[in-house]
Regions:
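Terminal amphipathic alpha-helical/low-complexity segments used for targeting or macromolecular assembly
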Residues: 1-48, 205
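Conserved active-site and cofactor/substrate-binding residues in soluble primary-metabolism enzymes
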Residues: 27, 31, 59, 77, ...
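A diffuse structural propensity rather than consistent per-protein peaks
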Residues: 28, 84-86, 127
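A short, structure-level motif marking secondary-structure boundaries and short turns
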Residues: 49-50, 117
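Short gly/ser/thr-rich secondary-structure transition/capping motifs
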Residues: 50-52, 160
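Glycine-rich phosphate/diphosphate-binding loop of Rossmann-like nucleotide-binding domains
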Residues: 52-62, 66-92, 96-97, 102
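Glycine-rich hexapeptide-repeat left-handed beta-helix
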Residues: 90-91, 103-205
Length: 205
């Protein structure tokens, strides 16, 4: 693995460490998501022998820990980091994403950050979202990451409505959150620690 990634663990960088000069100006989870590509500015692709998987690092490096399992017929597009003991299931498409150790993912994932021990083990689109540790997303859970009027996404945060400054933003999913099968999450949805989401329509943002 590249020396940059050996000496500065990505899993540490994305814990919102305010003392890190790298994230000195970042205040919110969406700032981290917008900065994913910056984490790889000094990295190079690193992965072992993976069969029947398409890896495209033309837009950024792909770094996969040797203990992870990438099942066949998966598409991986850089910049991308897949940590230790993580499983990426067959027919998945993952791009511009950081997946920490001991996760299980499937489906279409773009511009997301997964903290350790989280599962998205079934189909469904997850875009421009932050997923806390020990979250479990039920089959078919899908995020909207773009409004139909293409306006900037706003998020309710600490009792205030804050503009993310981007037309692309999905959801913030807290630690130990569980979503039922077929859950649809609107743009800018925030799910706090330990919530269980069961809904036949969009839950409140």
């Amino acid at each position: 693995m590249n020396e940059y990634l050996k000496n500065i663990m990505i899993s540490d960088l994305i814990l919102l460490d305010k003392h890190s000069s790298f994230f000195e100006s970042d205040q919110y989870p969406w700032d981290l998501i917008h900065s994913i590509s910056d984490l790889f500015s000094e990295a190079t692709s690193s992965y072992g022998s993976i069969e029947n998987v398409m890896i495209n690092d033309s837009n950024g490096p792909v770094v996969i820990d040797k203990t992870s399992i990438i099942e066949p017929f998966t598409v991986l597009k850089g910049p991308l980091f897949i940590g230790k003991n993580t499983l990426v299931k067959s027919h998945s498409t993952v791009s511009n994403t950081i997946i920490n150790h001991d996760c299980k993912v499937s489906g279409e994932i773009h511009s997301c950050i997964f903290q350790p021990y989280s599962n998205k083990a079934h189909e469904g689109f997850l875009g421009n979202s932050f997923i806390g540790s020990w979250a479990n997303l039920g089959a078919g859970t899908t995020t909207s990451n773009l409004k139909n009027n293409y306006s900037s996404v706003q998020v309710k945060w600490d009792g205030k409505l804050i503009d993310t400054g981007s037309i692309f933003f999905g959801s913030i999913i807290g630690e130990h959150v569980k979503t039922a099968i077929g859950t649809n999450l609107n743009t800018g949805t925030v799910i706090e620690l330990g919530c269980n989401i069961v809904s036949q329509s969009f839950p409140p943002r």
